């Protein structure tokens, strides 16, 4: 049985982690997640993605038992680099990815969620990076992404103390963008938002994601030039013609990604 299942309905893909009891992010999980992303990226029938954990947790972190098999600095650094590459791929993915968080998103689980474009969390979920409690540090880019969402001082407090925060606190801090009362509502809200994304032109969604994260590689001026270029490309697309025509005809547009 695969550790990650992939189901697609109405242009929305749901990736579900099946690794009880805590949905730990083992090497196998990371490999299967990468494989699922390969499928989603090339499938025109997928326009938005939800990542969710089966059972009690989104993901309670890395596979600690697997750590005992690492042999020295080289093995551990390689594990971190592989994890970082996957998280970067998720953040750079051309289709929006939503993390649907319930139970706990700790350690590598939170690093996975932070790499997603949007985080929706149950108010009683626990989110944190407790690696320092084990005498190690976050290795899947947690030290880089958390400060972007909550600021450097708050990131130091959260990582340095090793204490988790609730989904409600994470929403107040801006780490989570949408709150929910429980797991059922998390999934409901995630599917509703993913469906809205799926109604849009795939090309414009890809351009939007590229532009929102362009400051990682471009200056402000460079990002503006890229925006102007992508605007011109979008304006000439068949989807733009359809969108404008649908507006004039007072109907819902049917975008085809052309």
Curated annotation (Swiss-Prot):
Q: Which PROSITE patterns match?
A: ENOYL_COA_HYDRATASE
Provide the induction entry.
Repressed by FadR in the absence of LCFAs (fatty acids of 14-20 carbon atoms). When LCFAs are present in the medium, they are converted to long-chain acyl-CoAs, which antagonize FadR as to its binding to fadR boxes on target DNA and thus derepress transcription.
Query: Tell me, what's a Pfam family for it?
Result: ECH_1
UniProt entry tagged with the keyword Lyase? yes
What PANTHER family does this protein map onto? ENOYL-COA HYDRATASE-RELATED
**Function recorded in the entry:** Involved in the degradation of long-chain fatty acids.
Q: Which GO terms describe its molecular function?
A: enoyl-CoA hydratase activity
Q: State the UniProt keywords alphabetically.
A: Fatty acid metabolism, Lipid degradation, Lipid metabolism, Lyase
Q: Give the GO biological process terms.
A: fatty acid beta-oxidation
Q: What is this protein called?
A: Probable enoyl-CoA hydratase
The question of whether Membrane is a record keyword is answered with: no
């Amino acid at each position: 049985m695969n550790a990650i299942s992939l189901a697609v309905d109405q242009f929305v893909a749901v990736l579900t982690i099946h690794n009880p009891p805590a949905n730990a992010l083992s090497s196998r999980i990371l490999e299967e997640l990468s494989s699922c992303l390969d499928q989603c990226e090339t499938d025109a029938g997928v326009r938005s993605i939800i990542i969710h954990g089966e059972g009690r947790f989104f993901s309670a972190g890395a596979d600690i038992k697997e750590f005992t098999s690492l042999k020295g600095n080289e093995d551990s650094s390689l594990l971190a680099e592989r994890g970082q590459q996957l998280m970067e791929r998720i953040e750079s993915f051309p289709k929006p990815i939503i993390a649907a968080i319930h139970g706990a998103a700790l350690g590598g689980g939170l690093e996975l969620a932070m790499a997603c474009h949007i985080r929706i969390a149950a108010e009683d979920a626990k989110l944190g990076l407790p690696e320092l409690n084990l005498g190690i540090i976050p290795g899947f880019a947690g030290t880089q992404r958390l400060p972007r969402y909550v600021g450097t001082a708050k990131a130091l407090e959260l990582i340095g103390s090793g204490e988790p925060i609730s989904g409600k606190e994470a929403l107040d801090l801006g780490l989570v963008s949408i709150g929910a009362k429980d797991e059922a509502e998390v999934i409901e809200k995630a599917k509703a938002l993913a469906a809205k994304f799926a109604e849009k032109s795939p090309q414009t969604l890809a351009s939007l994601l590229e532009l929102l994260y362009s400051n990682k590689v471009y200056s402000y001026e460079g990002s503006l030039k890229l925006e102007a270029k992508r605007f011109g490309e979008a304006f000439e697309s068949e989807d733009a013609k359809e969108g404008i025509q649908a507006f004039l005809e007072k109907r819902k547009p049917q975008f085809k990604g052309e």
